[in-house]
C-alpha cells in the first residue's frame, strides 16, 4: 500500500500552483509564464482533478447515503483516497508527501465534497491537524509525525475547541503545567473531528497561568499521541449532517507530554493555531462549493425530468430564474476560494480573502441546498432523494473553522484597517 501511495506521489508531484479554470469553461491554449492572469489548469492539475472526480462519482456517491444512515466511519473510502494520493497533500516532499499548494488541495476537496461532505470532512480534518506541524514543527517532529502518514493511512486531529470556548479560542481552559522535561496537561476538548480515529492530535493549551497574559504568549501548541495515558476519548456524537465523520469530546487528565513535542516554543501556540486557518479555510470553502455544485446539478436534472402543468419544471420561468441564481452563486463562490488559495500559494497573507471565501461559500452552500429541496418539492423532503442530505450537511460549513459571524468580524477588521492605515 505504501508503494502505491508513493507511485501516486510521483505522478502528481509535478502539479503547478499557478492557474485554474472553472469546471464549466472550455479549455484554451495555456498562456506563457508571466503573461498575466489565467483560469487554465495545468495538464497535471486536470489529471488530479479528474482522479478525485472519478473517485467521488464512482466510489463515494453510491455508498454515501448508507454511511449517512449508519453513521459508520468510512474506512474503506479513506484508505482508497490515501492510495490515490488524495489525502495528506500538504505534507512536504522531504517527508514522502506531495508538497502541494492550497489551490491543488482545493481542487481535490471540491470534488470529494461533491460526493459526500462527511467523507471530505474526515479527509480535511487530517489536513487541519497537519498544518500546525507544517508551519510550526521542527524537522524531527515533522519526520516522526508527518512522515509516517505517507507510509500508512493514519489520521490526526486539530484539538482546540472546548465546551466553553468555540469561537473564543483565547478563552480555552485546558492547562499545560511544565514539570521538568514534561508538561502535564489537564482539560476537556469538544467537537473534535477525527477525535476517535486520530493517531495523534495538535493540542492547544494554556501554559501561562496568568489570566492577564496576552493570547499571543499564553498558549502553547503540543503534539499529543492518542494512546498517551490519561487521554480519554468520548462517545461519537450524532450530528445533524456529515454523519459519517467522527466527532467526539476528549478529556486530558494528567497527560504527560515531553517537551520535544512542543511546537516552535512555549507561548507560540495561539499564533500557530490561528495561522493554520489561512491555509485551511480555502479548502473548507472549496468543500462548500462542491456541495453547492451538487445541489445545483441535482436540481437541474430534476427540473429537466419533472413535469407540472404540462411542461418541464425548467420551462417555468420561476424555476429557471432560481436555477440561474444558483449558478451565479456557485461560480462566484468558486472564484472566491480560488483567489484565497492563490494568495497564500503566492506567499502573501490571505486572511481577508480566506474569510471572504469561507463565509460566502458556506452561505451559498446552505442557500443552494435549500433551493434544491424546493425544486424537488415534497420529494426533496424525503430520504429517497439526495437533496435532503445536502441540506443537513451544508449547515456545519457556517459553523466549523470559524462561524459565519466570526468571518465577518475578520473581514470588517481587515477591510476597515486598510483605510485606517
UniProtKB/Swiss-Prot annotation:
Transit peptide endpoints, chain numbering: 1-25
Organism lineage: Eukaryota, Metazoa, Chordata, Craniata, Vertebrata
The record's account of how the chain is modified after translation: Acetylated. Could occur at proximity of the cofactor-binding sites and reduce the catalytic activity. Could be deacetylated by SIRT3.
Source organism of the structure: Sus scrofa
Record-level Gene Ontology MF annotations: acyl-CoA dehydrogenase activity; flavin adenine dinucleotide binding; identical protein binding; medium-chain fatty acyl-CoA dehydrogenase activity
One Gene Ontology cellular component: mitochondrial membrane
N6-acetyllysine PTM positions: 79, 212, 217, 259, 271, 279, 301
Gene: ACADM
Coiled coil: none
Name the record gives this protein: Medium-chain specific acyl-CoA dehydrogenase, mitochondrial
